[in-house]
Amino acid sequence: MLQPKRTKFRKQQKGRNRGLAQSGNTVSFGDYGLKATTRGRLTARQIEAARRAINRHVKRGGKVWIRVFPDVPVTNKPLEVRQGKGKGNVEYWVAKVQPGTVLYEMEGVTEELAREAFRLAAAKLPVQTTFEYRKVM
């Protein structure tokens, strides 16, 4: 599971996820990419489940890049505990995703194989996505 090795602070405030992706919005490493079209939070488990779906479909061919990293801690209080007494414990980590963020990239496979692998991966994610090509300058 993805999570930071160490952080400056253990817990974070929730914040707001507004605007469009200013960086990480182009296919830079591979030939094809899976780009988010809606905003949301991807948990480390969802990122891993989608990665497994991609790798299972492409088998040994091709290389896959994960372009998002869950670096935001989400806290939760235990069940049946009254409010107060401080913030809850960190339960899981999320990556905040904005429209335009490239989530995964792939190279070394045919377009049909990449499309199908990304379709399987998109079913595991809570955001809507689209298939992207690398822009040749």
Swiss-Prot record:
A GO molecular-function annotation: structural constituent of ribosome
InterPro entries: Ribosomal_uL16, Ribosomal_uL16_bact-type, Ribosomal_uL16_CS, Ribosomal_uL16_dom, Ribosomal_uL16_sf
Top-level division of the source organism's lineage: Bacteria
CDD domains registered for this protein in UniProt: Ribosomal_L16_L10e
Region span, Disordered: 1-24
Positions with biased composition (Basic residues): 1-17
Keywords, comma-separated and alphabetical: Ribonucleoprotein, Ribosomal protein, RNA-binding, rRNA-binding, tRNA-binding
GO biological process, one term: translation
HAMAP family: Ribosomal_uL16
Family under the similarity heading: Belongs to the universal ribosomal protein uL16 family.
Protein name as it appears in the record: Large ribosomal subunit protein uL16
